[in-house]
């Protein structure tokens, strides 16, 4: 992505391909970027300079993948993991799989459907060429679904409404059901973690170019005209993907400042309106403030910075993900963390995967990021010696749409690679002691033991003094994981260590414990203790996954920073539910990420409606729920009515559970799960609360126990 350019700069121009124009017309608002030039008043220019005409034709034909799969082109021989299997790319849809799993003798397509679609498109292209008097070509104009699906998804996330199969709202439904980050940050003077701190999010490596004082063209919401008009605004403050803007002309008057997500389609570089014949109209409030607006703007714009011309194009490109619905993989069994299970990708949102267990119910799902260490390619468990549950395909799952669309196994290089390890000169041994984040209670760092050494650097770890004696609570960590630490790590960094049962935290001593258990500590040199300059600071706000209920992403705060280790506090919840995560964890996101991707964000407090909402009943199989109930922080003021969905118990715990709590009411299924809180005096007032676009019958009501 280009750096923010000065208004005086004029980049080189070249013709725009017609195919790419058509490609972008899929988006509501993105089509306005055609023939774009970064200089004001220029007549014709291009916003893409990296592709030749021949490359674009090949890409349209499906021969040059435009997604992260560009590392592999169709027919390129390449071994996956030493097994001799060759990967292949479907020439119709772009799905990556193994050649032996592909259809036909040529192995060009993943399924009969893709083969027929390719043939049909080839015929259509040939007929069209003859009608236009063009010479015939062997290349078929086919859809490259790997690229199109990402663009369609981005469009639906920003424009659409609806829910996933598990009841999770998406698109505009998710945004309205969320809360106002801008008001929350401004009212309390909070600071958000910069986008550049999160390596797994779109444009993280270019976001430092978005700076205070930058000029943009945005939709003018203070105008009474029949058509959409725009005006120039300055960036006053940045908070993750969101920026605080002020229309030009208000100068030091902050009364009309407004927040906007830079990922939306109504924010453009300076000059976009001139190129696309859009009208610049000053806000009605200050329309009479100046008589010569043109002269005023020229003085304000000379020498200023603006967004790169390809900003939205790069944003869309960075939101393409290699995982597709129907891919099979291995994932940790949430009911027994010492083993894995086969699962199928059901949904992909912003790189987060909703997985369905092959041998489970249709609602037996698991959420994680595609870079999560909890997922692995098919065959991983057998290769490293990890336990796996042998699944038997359920007959009633054959009718589930995801299982009917299984393409192939996800190839190994789609998963995040782990650091290579060398076992010469001493390695981890069974019985060695260390400190590790408890996978069943992520707010605790416990005394732990290496129970088994697997291949490829993986270790089976158990927490000393755990309730299980048969290895059911063992958990797999890689030797390079930042969730395991050498003995005395907590003591050196003033972190409370959770000792084994029968020991007191205040009096626990590692030397005495090792002598009593006749064991030895794992050498410090075996641990990965490097610490990057991550940029996180105490008090920064972000959006974090509740790993005890990984479907939920919540408003959170960085409570403590210990080298690369972050203590995440969920706003509005007691400190006992804090979680330790690594600074490069894919389970934390910048402010505005949920809005950008269309994922629902759980607010720190629940909205309080004027009337009770009708409970929604569902007739599904009752499931046990595990874990502790969350206690709300006592409010400063009692209220006669409390409304909202409770935080669910540990039903989707990615690492299983250790204690069984009370069961839910039979036949009761939570449709929309948000944390329930009392509204405090600092919560948004009733007038500023967004109106729900969905019927109140679709929201579940619960009462306190």
UniProtKB/Swiss-Prot annotation:
GO terms for biological process: ectoderm development; negative regulation of DNA-templated transcription; negative regulation of gene expression; stem cell differentiation; stem cell proliferation. The keyword Transport does not apply. Residues 38-49 have a biased composition (Low complexity). One of its GO terms (cellular component) is nucleoplasm. There is a cross-link at residues 405, 647, 659, 675, 700 (Glycyl lysine isopeptide (Lys-Gly) (interchain with G-Cter in SUMO2)). Residues 1-84, 608-665, 680-705 are annotated as: Disordered. Pfam families: MBT, zf-FCS_1. The keyword Protein biosynthesis does not apply. Zn(2+) binds at residues 90, 93, 110, 114. It is found in: Nucleus. MBT repeats lie at residues 179-283, 291-391, 397-500, 508-604. It comes from the Eukaryota. The modification Phosphothreonine is found at residue 76. The modification Phosphoserine is found at residues 13, 67, 338, 683, 688-689. A zinc finger (FCS-type) spans 81-116. Residues 619-634 have a biased composition (Basic residues). Keywords: Chromatin regulator, Isopeptide bond, Metal-binding, Nucleus, Phosphoprotein, Repeat, Transcription, Transcription regulation, Ubl conjugation, Zinc, Zinc-finger. Putative Polycomb group (PcG) protein. PcG proteins maintain the transcriptionally repressive state of genes, probably via a modification of chromatin, rendering it heritably changed in its expressibility. Its association with a chromatin-remodeling complex suggests that it may contribute to prevent expression of genes that trigger the cell into mitosis. Binds to monomethylated and dimethylated 'Lys-20' on histone H4. Binds histone H3 peptides that are monomethylated or dimethylated on 'Lys-4', 'Lys-9' or 'Lys-27'. Part of the E2F6.com-1 complex in G0 phase composed of E2F6, MGA, MAX, TFDP1, CBX3, BAT8, EUHMTASE1, RING1, RNF2, MBLR, BAT8 and YAF2. This is Lethal(3)malignant brain tumor-like protein 2. It comes from Homo sapiens (Human). The gene is L3MBTL2.
């Amino acid at each position: 992505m280009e750096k923010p350019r000065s208004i005086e700069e004029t980049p080189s121009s070249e013709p725009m391909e017609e195919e790419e124009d058509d490609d972008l017309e899929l988006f509501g608002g993105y089509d306005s970027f055609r023939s774009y030039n970064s200089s004001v008043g220029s007549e014709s220019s291009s916003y893409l300079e990296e592709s030749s005409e021949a490359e674009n034709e090949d890409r349209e034909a499906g021969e040059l993948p435009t997604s992260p799969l560009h590392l592999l082109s169709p027919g390129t021989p390449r071994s996956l993991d030493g097994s001799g299997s060759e990967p292949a790319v479907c020439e119709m849809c772009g799905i990556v799989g193994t050649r032996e799993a592909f259809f036909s003798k040529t192995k060009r397509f993943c399924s009969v459907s893709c083969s027929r679609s390719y043939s049909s498109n080839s015929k259509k292209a040939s007929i069209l060429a003859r009608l236009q008097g063009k010479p015939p070509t062997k290349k078929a104009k086919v859809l490259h679904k790997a690229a199109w699906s990402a663009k369609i998804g981005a469009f639906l996330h920003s424009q659409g409404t609806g829910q996933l199969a598990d009841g999770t709202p998406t698109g505009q439904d998710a945004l309205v059901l969320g809360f106002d980050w801008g008001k929350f940050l401004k009212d309390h003077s909070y600071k958000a973690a910069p986008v550049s701190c999160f390596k797994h999010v779109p444009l993280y490596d270019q976001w430092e170019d978005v700076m205070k004082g930058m000029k943009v063209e945005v939709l003018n919401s203070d105008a009474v005209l029949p058509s959409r008009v725009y005006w120039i605004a300055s960036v006053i403050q940045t908070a993750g993907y969101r920026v605080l803007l002020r229309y030009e002309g208000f100068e030091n008057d902050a009364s009309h400042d407004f927040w906007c997500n830079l990922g939306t389609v109504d924010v453009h570089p300076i000059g976009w309106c001139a190129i696309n014949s859009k009208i610049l109209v000053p806000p009605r409030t200050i329309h009479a403030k100046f008589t010569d607006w043109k002269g005023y703007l020229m003085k304000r714009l000379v020498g200023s910075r603006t967004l790169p011309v390809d900003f939205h194009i790069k944003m869309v490109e960075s939101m393409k993900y290699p995982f597709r619905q129907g891919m099979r993989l291995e994932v940790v069994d949430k009911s027994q963390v010492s083993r894995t299970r086969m699962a199928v990708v059901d949904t992909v949102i912003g790189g987060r995967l909703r997985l369905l267990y092959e041998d489970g119910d249709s609602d037996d799902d698991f959420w994680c990021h595609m870079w999560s260490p909890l997922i692995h390619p098919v065959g991983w468990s057998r290769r490293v010696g990890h336990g796996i549950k042998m699944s038997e395909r359920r007959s009633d799952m054959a009718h589930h749409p995801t299982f009917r669309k299984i393409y192939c196994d996800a190839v190994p290089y789609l998963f995040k690679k782990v650091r290579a390890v060398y076992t010469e000169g001493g390695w981890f041994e069974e019985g060695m002691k260390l400190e590790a984040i408890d996978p069943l209670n992520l707010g605790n760092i416990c005394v732990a033991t290496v129970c088994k050494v697997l291949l490829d650097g993986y270790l089976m770890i158990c927490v000393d003094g755990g309730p299980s004696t048969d290895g059911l609570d063992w958990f797999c960590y890689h030797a390079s994981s930042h969730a395991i630490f050498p003995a005395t790590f907590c003591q050196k960094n003033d972190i409370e260590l959770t000792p084994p049962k029968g020991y007191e935290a205040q009096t626990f001593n590692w030397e005495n414990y090792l002598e009593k258990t006749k064991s030895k500590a794992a050498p410090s040199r075996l641990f990965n203790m490097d610490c990057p300059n991550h940029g996180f600071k105490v008090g920064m706000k972000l959006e974090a996954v509740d790993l005890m209920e990984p479907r939920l992403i919540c408003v959170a705060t960085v409570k403590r920073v210990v080298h690369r280790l972050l203590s995440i506090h969920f706003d509005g919840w007691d400190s006992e539910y804090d979680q330790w995560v690594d600074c490069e964890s894919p389970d934390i996101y910048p402010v505005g990420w949920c809005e950008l991707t269309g994922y629902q964000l759980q607010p720190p407090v629940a909205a309080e409606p004027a009337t009770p909402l009708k409970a929604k009943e569902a007739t599904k199989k009752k499931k046990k729920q595990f874990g502790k109930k969350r206690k709300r922080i006592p409010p400063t003021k009692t209220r006669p009515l409390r409304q909202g969905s409770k935080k669910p118990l540990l039903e989707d715990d990615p690492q299983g559970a250790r204690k069984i709590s009370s069961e839910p009411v039979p036949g009761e299924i939570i449709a929309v799960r948000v944390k329930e809180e009392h509204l405090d005096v600092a919560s948004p007032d009733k007038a500023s609360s967004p109106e729900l676009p969905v019927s109140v019958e679709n929201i579940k009501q619960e009462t306190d126990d």
